[in-house]
């Protein structure tokens, strides 16, 4: 069940969050104007965090559902202390480096949560990587194509729309073409409603 939930999470969160990272520049410029342009890399880093955050939450829920609230508490306290140390160390370098350090630490800490879940239910890292890698690679390929198609447009609104439309069409088309089980189940669920 966990592996299916991880696949579903990757199927949804990777295109949405990495897609937001792709349109971050246009989104910031359109919504809050040029003066906020330095925030674009911060938003992109937070999108990377957001792509993997739901997977981490699944691991945390495994720990809690097995009655290991002590592990949950200790892991969160240790990570909180690590965040404070990173904040202090990165303070002289500015907020961008603070966010980058946080995202990197979070991704590394995801492995800690995986170790706890693996100990409790026997899920292997190899299987998790095998489950999420296709969605990750398809998402990166789709977004690369969308970036390339939109690259030649000088109009920010057209570029923004092209990135979203091309990404959505390609992602759905590829999922349909490779006969993704998760995709078919989602479509089936939506049609039943």
PLM regions: where:
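Short alpha-helical transmembrane segments in multi-pass integral membrane proteins
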Residues: 8-17, 76-80, 96-118, 164-168
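Specific pore-lining/lateral-gate transmembrane helices of multi-pass inner-membrane transport
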Residues: 1-77
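Membrane-proximal transmembrane or re-entrant/amphipathic helices at the cytosolic face
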Residues: 118-125, 132, 147-193
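Short helix-capping/hinge motifs at transmembrane helix termini and TM-loop junctions
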Residues: 23-28, 32-36, 67-68, 90-95, ...
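Alpha-helical transmembrane segments of multi-pass membrane proteins
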Residues: 3-12, 79, 126, 130, ...
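Hydrophobic alpha-helical transmembrane segments in multi-pass integral membrane proteins
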Residues: 84-88, 139-154
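Residue-level signature of transmembrane alpha-helical entry/exit and packing/kink sites
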Residues: 38-42, 94, 98, 127, ...
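Alpha-helical transmembrane segments of multi-pass membrane transporters/permeases
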Residues: 59-88, 96-99, 131-132
